[in-house]
């Protein structure tokens, strides 16, 4: 997962799961959700359009997804810029240079 600089753009949408939280992104084929991921430093995933968010909801609830979710548990919302900013400010990502061996 990497921070998406497009989160600075106005507008946008996010996907929320009823019990897992707000979609943060995916890595190695796994979806990450705040707060259940326990990785607030990644902030929230911003979809530029409602259609792109809907495409991802469709994928997450399809047989093509390795662990499909119930479509009833997923909702598309306006992107919460304030919450994204709070998470990435209060929980900055550690630099690889700062990671002890």
Describe each region flagged by the PLM:
Residues 6-43, 69-71, 76:
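Short aromatic-glycine-(Arg/Gly/Cys) micro-motifs in beta-strand/loop hairpins
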Residues 44-45, 50-101:
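Short, mixed-charge low-complexity intrinsically disordered segments
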Residues 1-3, 54:
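Charged, amphipathic alpha-helical segments
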